[in-house]
């Protein structure tokens, strides 16, 4: 464990006593270093190792501590102003910073300090919260939201109005993860640490949390908290045992084929900056 991790973990244990006025310099410096690491993408709240997603809880603790050590402050917004503890990711950016960063940011898209936006990302008017990681080639479409610490893979399309849940508390919960080459349909919600594995397609209006039944009709089995790689998922219902009513579920109707991929493929013309 690094010294940085030790400082943050120790401070988190006494977080209730920490305020912007009494926080020690070394704690504040450690928290801001962790936030900067998240902001640059050199550290991630969750990362895949040997096929498994590993959560770095100490970084989640750093994000939570950042709210304890800052007062709300006046934040200029050009056409409007804000009042918050966390500044905008690009509060002090100039045109050169944007060119070197390689992402396209369409007004009034917002990303908070401590989120990472990789080169080749397109942010339509959308929102990316602190601790989130958005990888290269991804489109975050209009009114989509990427919650705190959520992990979005490469070449993902988050359609209009999509909600990707944030998970800062409880700390043992894993963040919501959308792996590479996924398509999330308009107005769908993926929350509570659910993992959508690589190459999956989620249809419009599908809601998936940890308690949502995910029914694989080919295998006639029910999953929770995970959409297997290459799945095509739509909203549906499963009947009760007595047949008197049905309850919502997500249905895996098939695995992705080339025809489906061609329909949801990334439009490179829209990604070129």
Curated annotation (Swiss-Prot):
GO cellular component, one term: cytoplasm
Entry's EC annotation: 2.3.1.117
The keyword Transmembrane belongs to this UniProt entry's keyword annotation: no
InterPro entries named among the record's database cross-references: DapD_Trfase_Hexpep_rpt_fam (IPR005664), Hexapep (IPR001451), Hexapep_transf_CS (IPR018357), THP_succinylTrfase_dom1 (IPR023180), THP_succinylTrfase_N_sf (IPR037133), Trimer_LpxA-like_sf (IPR011004)
Catalyzed reaction equations: (S)-2,3,4,5-tetrahydrodipicolinate + succinyl-CoA + H2O = (S)-2-succinylamino-6-oxoheptanedioate + CoA
GO MF terms held by the record: 2,3,4,5-tetrahydropyridine-2,6-dicarboxylate N-succinyltransferase activity; nucleotidyltransferase activity
Protein name: 2,3,4,5-tetrahydropyridine-2,6-dicarboxylate N-succinyltransferase
HAMAP family noted in UniProt: DapD
Gene source species: Thioalkalivibrio sulfidiphilus (strain HL-EbGR7)
PANTHER family (alphabetical): 2,3,4,5-TETRAHYDROPYRIDINE-2,6-DICARBOXYLATE N-SUCCINYLTRANSFERASE, MOLYBDENUM COFACTOR GUANYLYLTRANSFERASE
Similarity comment text for this entry: Belongs to the transferase hexapeptide repeat family.
Keywords: Acyltransferase, Amino-acid biosynthesis, Cytoplasm, Diaminopimelate biosynthesis, Lysine biosynthesis, Repeat, Transferase
SUPFAM superfamilies xrefs: Trimeric LpxA-like enzymes
Residues engaged in binding substrate: 104, 141
Assembly mode: Homotrimer.
């Amino acid at each position: 464990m690094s010294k940085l991790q030790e400082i943050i973990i120790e401070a988190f244990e006494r977080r209730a006593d920490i305020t912007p006025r009494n926080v020690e310099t070394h704690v504040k410096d450690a928290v801001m270093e962790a936030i900067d690491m998240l902001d640059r993408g050199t550290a991630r709240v969750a990362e895949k190792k040997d096929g498994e997603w590993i959560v770095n809880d100490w970084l989640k603790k750093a994000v939570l501590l950042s709210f304890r050590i800052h007062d709300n402050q006046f934040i200029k917004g050009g056409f409007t102003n804000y009042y918050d503890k966390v500044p905008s990711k690009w509060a002090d950016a100039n045109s050169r910073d944007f060119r070197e960063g390689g992402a396209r940011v369409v007004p009034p898209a917002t990303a908070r300090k401590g989120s990472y936006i990789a080169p080749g990302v397109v942010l339509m008017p959308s929102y990316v919260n602190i601790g989130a990681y958005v990888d290269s080639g991804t489109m975050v479409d209009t009114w989509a939201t990427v919650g705190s610490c959520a992990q979005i893979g490469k070449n993902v399309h988050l359609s209009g109005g999509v909600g990707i849940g944030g998970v800062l508390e409880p700390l043992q919960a894993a963040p919501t993860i959308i792996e590479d080459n996924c398509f999330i349909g308009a107005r769908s919600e993926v929350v509570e640490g659910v993992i959508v594995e690589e190459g999956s397609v989620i249809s419009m209006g599908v809601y998936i949390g940890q308690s949502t039944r995910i029914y694989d009709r080919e295998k006639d089995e029910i999953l929770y908290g995970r959409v297997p790689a290459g799945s095509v998922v739509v909203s549906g219902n499963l009947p009760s045992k007595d047949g008197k009513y049905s309850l919502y579920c997500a249905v895996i109707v098939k695995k992705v084929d080339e025809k489906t991929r061609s329909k949801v493929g990334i439009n490179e013309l829209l990604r070129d900056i």
